Amino acid sequence: ALDRVHVVSDDVGWCAERLGDLLRRYAGTVDYRPPTSTPQGDFRMVATSPRIIGTNSTFSYWGGYVSNVIHGPQSTVVMPAFHARHMDGGRAYQLDPAWEIVEDIPGGWDG
């Protein structure tokens, strides 16, 4: 189990509602982005983390790329396969082959 998970999102309410119980199964503490944080601080938090569970966003992709450079083989990046409905059957083309890919979640991506 992890000691702590820090959630960075522009919709922490959705994250707490949809992911809170799941995250608490794996981490002693779940922290959510404070309302006073800045985009630069959020990016620094994500990019310097050795383990990232990202979203289908440019912000997360770049955080994962930078984490890979900083932490090398010790970096673990988990990203969803889904990106956008109108492209390539919804699958993200930006995924690094070194990342772990989540194909689906319980209830689906819209659930």
What are these regions (language model features)?
Residues 1-111:
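N-terminal targeting/anchoring "stem" of glycan-biosynthesis enzymes
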